[in-house]
From Swiss-Prot:
Organism, as annotated: Pelodictyon phaeoclathratiforme (strain DSM 5477 / BU-1)
Subunit and partners: Part of the 50S ribosomal subunit.
Protein name: Large ribosomal subunit protein uL6
Keywords: Ribonucleoprotein, Ribosomal protein, RNA-binding, rRNA-binding
GO BP terms: cytoplasmic translation
Segments crossing the lipid bilayer: none
Length: 179
């Protein structure tokens, strides 16, 4: 049995779960998330624990078992605590600011980059070189953070660009000088 899939998901008293046909809905103080289930797994809830079981031992069912267990676990965490990704901007003159609901980035190009986040995502700029992306859907938070990072990925020679908090940029040496 899948090591991840066999672990039950504890429900906090703030989170409620509804299972209808092949849909699962998790609601909590921060919002509501829905997920469509595959026919390879079944989900049940009893005594504040959610269990995910697979219908057979096929290779596909085994793969789906752990996947859906983690998706549901992330949904429960999202509606109770939420998720946040922190981005750091490094480089002379590189900065971010929030204009209305647009993230305005100055990243060394001849123009500013304006980014509109989806409605479910909240973007904060505590200072000019830090961007916080938060929301209840872990995948969407990661996707938006990756999109913002893609505007100017960190380069290996000087380390300029946008990186995740704690990300280690492998640095390279420049060209060796001639004789």
């Amino acid at each position: 049995m899948s090591r991840i899939g066999k672990m039950p998901i504890p429900l906090s008293n703030q989170a409620k779960i509804e299972i209808k046909d092949s849909n699962i809905r998790v609601s909590g103080p921060k919002g509501t998330l829905e997920q469509r289930l595959t026919d390879q797994v079944t989900v049940s809830e009893e005594n504040g624990l959610v269990t995910v079981l697979r219908i057979d031992d096929s290779k596909k069912a085994k793969a789906q078992h752990g996947l859906y267990r983690m998706l549901i676990s992330n949904m429960v965490d999202g509606v109770t605590k939420g998720f946040t990704r922190k981005l750091e901007i490094a480089g002379v003159g590189y900065r971010a600011e929030l204009k209305n609901d647009l993230l305005a980035l100055t990243l060394g190009y001849s123009h500013m980059i304006y980014f509109k986040a989806p409605d479910e995502i909240k973007i904060e700029v505590p200072d000019q070189v830090t961007v916080l992306v938060s929301g209840i859907d872990k995948a969407l938070v990661g996707q938006v953070a990756a999109k913002i990072r893609s505007f100017r990925k960190p380069e290996p020679y000087r380390g300029k660009g946008i990186k995740y908090e704690g990300e280690v940029i492998r640095r390279k040496e420049g060209k060796a000088a001639g004789k």
